[in-house]
Swiss-Prot record:
Fluoride-specific ion channel. Important for reducing fluoride concentration in the cell, thus reducing its toxicity. This is Fluoride-specific ion channel FluC. One of its GO terms (cellular component) is plasma membrane. Keywords: Cell inner membrane, Cell membrane, Ion channel, Ion transport, Membrane, Metal-binding, Sodium, Transmembrane, Transmembrane helix, Transport. It catalyses: fluoride(in) = fluoride(out). The chain crosses the membrane at residues 5-25, 29-49, 66-86, 95-115. It comes from Thermus thermophilus (strain ATCC 27634 / DSM 579 / HB8).
């Protein structure tokens, strides 16, 4: 039961962080492109790579990994928003933006997850 509570609390925290940070980013960069989801998913990808490496190196307990990776980062990142916003761009006739957003999100996320993983290795030694 404790593990479920860790995931639930982490998910609530991650969702609140996504909402607040997303509003800040979108307000700063303006409408016309889903900057907030791109930013949040990119940051979350970096942090999941970092969390994975720290966990593999024994620097995080299993409970901390559940709280951070499954809870906080699971609530923080959002694939459903990426899908919705890509579809909205397509329906608006902005095919180029939609493709840039979808593929850019995927490649940026993978690249940042790799960087986070490498940073975790450097931090642990």
């Amino acid at each position: 039961m404790e593990r479920y509570l860790l995931v639930a609390l982490g998910g609530a925290l991650g969702s609140l962080l996504r909402y607040g940070l997303g509003a800040l980013v979108q307000g700063s960069l303006g409408a016309g492109f889903p900057w907030s989801t791109l930013f949040v998913n990119a940051l979350g990808s970096f942090l999941i790579g970092l969390t994975l490496r720290l966990s593999l190196e024994g620097a995080l307990s299993g409970e901390a990994r559940l709280f951070l990776a499954v809870g906080v980062l699971g609530g923080f990142t959002t694939f459903s928003s990426l899908s919705y916003e890509t579809l909205a761009l397509l329906q608006g006739g902005e095919v180029g933006k939609a493709l840039l957003y979808a593929f850019g999100s995927l490649f940026l996320g993978l690249f940042l997850a790799f960087l986070g993983y490498r940073l975790g290795g450097a931090l642990v030694g």
